[in-house]
Regions:
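Expand to "…catalyze enediolate/carbanion chemistry for C-C bond making/breaking, isomerization
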Residues: 129, 153, 166-168, 172-174, ...
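Short, electropositive alpha-helical surface patch
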Residues: 50-72, 177-185
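Short beta-strand/loop segments at the ligand-binding rim of alpha/beta enzyme cores
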Residues: 43-53, 94-105, 152-163
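Catalytic cores of alpha/beta
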Residues: 109-119, 161, 165-181
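Surface-exposed amphipathic alpha-helices with a cationic face
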Residues: 36-41, 70, 91-95, 145-155, ...
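Glycine-rich phosphate-binding active-site loops on the catalytic face of alpha/beta enzymes
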Residues: 1-8, 72, 76-78, 83, ...
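Active-site-adjacent beta->alpha loops and helix N-cap segments on the catalytic face
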Residues: 5-17, 24-37, 57-64, 79-96, ...
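Non-catalytic positions within long, well-ordered alpha-helices that form the structural scaffold/packing
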Residues: 70-71, 118, 152, 175
Length: 224
């Protein structure tokens, strides 16, 4: 569940514009947690991860955010601009509510750095498949297969791959080497098209169809 931010430096055009639309309607981090709580009322089992940037969480206060996130039914966060060296206070707050601190690794993360990334991480490791922003380019599974294997070995955590995955075919290829696949921009683009055309009912239809495509493709994969 994406939390909008004014300076989303890791995101491509689609998610940047989505964030601007949300901010134009005065959407706050507290509103994002309210949305999580509404979802949790209907679904008590699907994990909820809030993804965004550190500044809004810092402004709310790590302890206050951790408490509010827990009460909303959130299971963890991905704060893409908060490095391991600076998240000690956050981890302390999260530990009180068993919230996961999900960290990121990239194709340029070497093994010694991976050990630091893995230290204190929980939930899963988010592996950025391309050097760039969200929605940019296409990921090459063969190019990162060795990185994924190393990340699993060093971290002891499940590794999910994101950035550059938009179709069922791409998701299936990534599922062969990873424990999960993260797709964001492709879903947001359905919302953008609906916003531009005024066909607001089209957004959930398009997102639902994409979710089925991705899920069906991944379920055909047999791990070696």
């Amino acid at each position: 569940l994406g939390a909008p931010f004014t300076d989303p430096m890791a995101d491509g055009a689609s998610i940047q514009k989505a964030g601007l639309r949300a901010l134009a309607h005065h959407t706050t981090l507290a509103d994002t947690l309210k949305l999580a709580a509404r979802f949790r009322e209907q679904d008590q089992t699907t994990p909820i991860i809030v993804m965004g940037y550190a500044n809004p969480v810092f402004r709310m206060g790590y302890a206050e955010f951790a408490k509010a996130a827990h009460e909303a039914g959130v299971d963890g966060t991905i704060l893409v601009d908060l490095p391991p060296e600076e998240d000690g206070e956050l981890r302390e707050a999260y530990a009180q509510y068993d919230l996961s601190v999900i960290r990121l690794a990239t194709p340029t993360t070497h093994e010694n750095r991976m050990k630091k990334v893995a230290e204190g991480a929980s939930g899963f490791l988010y592996f950025v498949a391309v050097t760039g922003v969200t929605g940019a380019g296409s990921a090459d599974p063969q190019a990162i297969a060795g990185n994924i294997e190393m990340a699993k070995r060093v971290s002891g955590l499940p590794v999910c791959v994101g950035f550059g995955v938009k179709t069922g075919v791409q998701a299936a290829e990534m599922a062969k080497i990873a424990d999960g696949v993260v797709v964001g921009s492709a879903f947001v683009e359905h919302a953008e098209k609906a916003h531009e055309s005024g066909d607001f009912a089209g957004a959930p239809r398009g997102m639902g169809a994409l979710a089925k495509e991705l899920s069906s493709a991944i379920r055909t994969i047999t791990k070696p």
